[in-house]
Amino acid sequence: MSIEQLKSKLSEGAKDIKLNLSTILTEEGAPDLMKNQIGGIALASAYATRNPGIIDTILSEVSSYLTKPEINAAKSAATIMAMNNIYYRFIHLVSDKSFSTMPAKLRMNVIGNPGIDKLNFELNCLAVSVINGCGMCIDAHTQELTKAGASKLAIQSSVRIAAVLNATAIGIEIGGQ
């Protein structure tokens, strides 16, 4: 399925999402990001939406220019953040702060060795963390990105890609109801 076909699954009430979907996956629409960064962020975000149509569409769009390690890193970002975002959202929200002093005892080796450029992996992880709503992880990834030299515009572009793909998934889900 193409992006145009994906957009056709959205109702007229999702016109803004259709327009945003047309622009956010371009270098002009995602300032300070390179094409492979946009593709990785979009693919990690697609996996985070859990929508098979979006996953297939984005994978089809990016597979011509993302490397196998970049595709694998998008999968890794989505899966490791699925675990971390739940765990650290609990740590952040629970009123008993003694939990934050306990070791997580969760394996997270992929974060230290993602198989691609660390900054690109952090962009993917930030996007997934935004979709999953973990404030503690959002802060941590934003700090890592800033430390690594990512601009605020690049960080915002990553979040915008995540937001639009998440809205696309919801729009498709409720479109025919």
Regions found by a protein language model. Give the residues of each.
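Hydrophobic alpha-helical segments
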Residues: M1-Q177
